[in-house]
């Protein structure tokens, strides 16, 4: 075993780890029912745009048998009713590069927000002792035309500054950490 190669592989795996999602990983370690993933046979369309993935907090806004059927469908699919469900377009994922796939999954994971206090510490539920989660919106949501006419607000300016830096995760590091690439 080449130690420098092994050390390099460990470094690359660490580079893919995102501490922003530690609150999810910790819950999954103790409770696999927190999150489930599903494949869709095609993209969805919303607001005239293709939707390749969607994260949703699982809620049944039905009563009686409708709710019971929906819960049973989840149990049939996953063996449990998850708190959050991420659905991705299988057709897109099949042809996506490793980078595109990882980015899609990470984007959807960012929608699982964790409540924090004014010091940035995670807020825990008094009843369950678990972190309080919510379905998070996007950090920056603005129209190109709006920025052209009125300029960039603080969130857009921050995004521009961040985008000037090289990404933390390179294509090479993704391939080195991909189970299919490493095993195959």
Show where each model-derived region lies.
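Single conserved hydrophobic/aromatic residue that forms the stacking wall/gate
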Residues: 1-7, 11
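Hydrophobic transmembrane signal anchors and adjacent membrane-proximal interface regions, especially
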Residues: 10-14, 106, 145
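Active-site recognition of the HExxH zinc-binding catalytic motif
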Residues: 103-115
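Metalloprotease/metallohydrolase-associated module, dominated by Zn2+-dependent proteases
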Residues: 15-35, 39-87, 91-95, 115-184
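…; additionally, a secondary subgroup of soluble metalloenzymes is captured
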Residues: 98
């Amino acid at each position: 075993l080449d130690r420098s190669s092994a050390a390099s592989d460990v470094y690359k795996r660490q580079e893919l780890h995102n501490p922003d999602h530690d609150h999810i990983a910790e819950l999954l370690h103790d409770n696999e029912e927190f999150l489930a993933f599903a494949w869709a046979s095609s993209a969805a369309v919303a607001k005239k745009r293709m939707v390749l993935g969607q994260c949703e907090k699982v809620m049944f806004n039905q009563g009686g048998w409708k709710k019971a059927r929906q819960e049973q469908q989840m149990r049939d699919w996953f063996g449990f009713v998850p708190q959050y469900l991420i659905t991705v377009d299988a057709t897109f994922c099949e042809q996506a590069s490793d980078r595109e796939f990882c980015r899609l999954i990470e984007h959807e994971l960012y929608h699982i927000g964790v409540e924090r206090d004014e010091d940035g510490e995670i807020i825990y539920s008094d009843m369950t002792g678990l972190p309080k989660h919510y379905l998070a919106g996007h950090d920056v949501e603005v129209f190109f035309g709006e920025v052209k006419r009125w300029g960039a607000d603080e969130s857009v300016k921050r995004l521009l500054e961040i985008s000037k830096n090289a990404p933390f995760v390179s294509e090479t590091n993704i391939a080195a950490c991909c189970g299919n690439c490493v095993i195959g």
